[in-house]
Design a protein with these regions (language model features):
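C-terminal peripheral helix-coil segments that are non-catalytic and often amphipathic
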Residues: 1-9, 109, 113-124, 150-179, ...
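Helix-turn-helix
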Residues: 24, 32-74
Length: 272
């Protein structure tokens, strides 16, 4: 999408009137795409939800594919505002060769940002959740996945896997490190993709700020326990390998010492 199609902020602050209309269309489109999918959503329905005439969509986005792309870009922009600080912090602690407790805290900060984005940001989370669900099902245009992967998932997964690798003594591309990262993030996933089931089980009607903090505290504690355990296991394995390596050298050293002593004894006898 060319720059003329992007939101433009005036120097005085806020959005120009045309950009307000564009934003309304995007929010309406996220809702429509989430409910009906790309094929089921119509430009007429999107225009009606946004309170504009159908030709306005063509003016701002050219076609329905352009609207869909703009929705993915909008979600990526809004999400990155939440994730950029924790991703930057994680990259810094990794480059500073920080100790394990600092690395664990950095990973937990990423999880908390994910939870905030899922539950606590007042920017149409329900509609965006449906949009995400359809995109993940693989039946929607691939452009959304490409945008969200490049701008959100890849940066998050990169620092997340590097943190896990450093904490647990593996490599970032090791399947074990990736499985551990995904399983830790998966603690939040059930509440995001199956809210009806989880809320009914808990007797909740929604996840407000207080309940969101309870979720974060629970996940934070569980994540810390697991990361500390995996770190300790890795340290113990290193020590065990070091002892084994050291132990294997002792018999060789003793054998060499015996041979040296024998040679000295033989030499002494010959001199006599």
């Amino acid at each position: 999408m060319n720059d003329t199609k992007r939101l433009r902020r005036p120097s005085a602050g806020g959005y120009v009137r045309g950009d307000e209309t564009r934003l309304r269309i995007i929010e309406a489109a996220i809702e429509s795409f989430g409910e009906h999918g790309f094929e089921g959503a119509s430009t007429r329905d999107i225009a009606a939800r946004a309170g504009v005439n159908a030709p306005a969509l063509q003016y701002y986005f050219e076609n329905k594919e352009g609207v869909y792309r703009a929705c993915a870009e909008y979600i990526a922009d809004a999400s990155w505002e939440t994730f950029e600080p924790v991703v930057t912090h994680a990259a810094e602690v990794l480059s500073n060769d920080s100790d394990t407790p600092v690395l664990i805290d950095a990973f937990i900060r990423i999880q908390e940002a994910i939870a905030d984005r899922m539950f606590l940001k007042a920017c149409g989370p329900t509609n965006q959740r449906l949009f995400f669900a359809r995109e993940q099902a693989g039946h929607e245009p691939s452009i959304a996945s490409e945008i969200l992967t490049r701008r959100l998932r890849q940066p998050l997964n990169d620092v997340g896997s590097r943190l896990i690798a450093r904490i647990t003594g593996t490599k970032p591309d090791d399947p074990l490190a990736l499985i551990r990262m995904l399983s830790l993030h998966g603690q939040l996933l059930m509440f995001h993709v199956a809210p009806r089931t989880t809320l009914a089980l808990l007797g909740w009607t929604e996840i407000d700020a207080e309940k969101g903090e309870l979720l974060k505290a629970t996940v934070r504690a569980q994540t810390r326990i697991l990361l500390e355990q995996w770190s300790n296991e890795a340290s113990n394995e290193v020590l065990a390998n070091a002892r084994e390596s050291s132990g294997s050298k002792k018999p060789v050293a003793r054998a060499v010492a015996k041979k040296t002593a024998a040679r000295k004894s033989t030499t002494a006898s010959a001199k006599k």
